[in-house]
Amino acid sequence: VAQRPPSAAVLVLHGGRETGTEPPPAGLLNLPGTRMRPFVRAVARAAREDGDDILVTQVRYAHRGWNGARADPFHDAVAALDALREEAGEELPVVLLGHSMGARAALRAAGHPLVRGVVGLAPWCPPGDPVTQLAGRDVVLVHSNRDRMTSPQATQSLTARARRAGARSCMVTVRGGDHAMIRRAAAWHRLTIALVTGLLGSGSLPGRVGEALALPPTAEATEGTLDLDLDLGPGPFRVSPVRGS
């Protein structure tokens, strides 16, 4: 019996290095990939509980780093999206969930026809990165105010640039978090579940996220920046137990 294709998909893209042409380590030795496993489990569990047939899977990278103009993880993301389209058809809605370098790859690949939205966690947002491919997409970027690896200020700037380019975009600040999302891990997990399922339409967006996504292109960067505790928490979004959180 042929297996029915999923109703939606979430592609998860883990972090990496600025430069590294070697393949990522296998299994648990791939620490950025290992860190995203609780997010994969949490989103998949939420979908099952709601009776939704959503495919949640990590993208495999051929190389460990971004590698300048090569933008290797971007091409890996596009290849994964093309494979999904071949398997499930042109109408499959996809949300890209990326952390750090993976968020950069997700943002770059968002112009693919299957992509409905992007959730970027502690994203790496260099000032010169393009945003035109984000037009018509929902983009929510989540960043700790204490991140020392990637810049929350750069994330706020990209959010505003994306909005001017035609995206529905906003930023959520996690006070007291960190780049690896170890501090306040449960909050990162719960928020991510709510954002991903909300963007796919199988759940409600938390707090004022929907309102922020609807801001006009001329809105100031600060208008599109929400605080997890003040604007979203504790909020109606799901509390889902995750191992290690």
What positions do the PLM features span?
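Short, surface-exposed "cap/lid" segments of acyl-processing enzymes
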Residues: V1-G51
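Short alpha-helix in the alpha/beta-hydrolase fold that links the catalytic acid
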Residues: P25, S151-R161
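Alpha/beta-hydrolase active-site loop
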Residues: N67-E87
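Short beta-strand immediately N-terminal to the catalytic nucleophile in serine-hydrolase-like folds
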Residues: L96-G98, L121, V142
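Gly/Ala-rich beta-loop-alpha elbow adjacent to hydrolase catalytic centers
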Residues: L97-G102, A106
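A conserved short beta-strand
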Residues: L114-C125
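Short beta-strand/loop motif that positions the catalytic acidic residue
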Residues: L134-A135, V140-D147
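C-terminal catalytic histidine-bearing segment of alpha/beta-hydrolase fold enzymes
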Residues: R168-S245
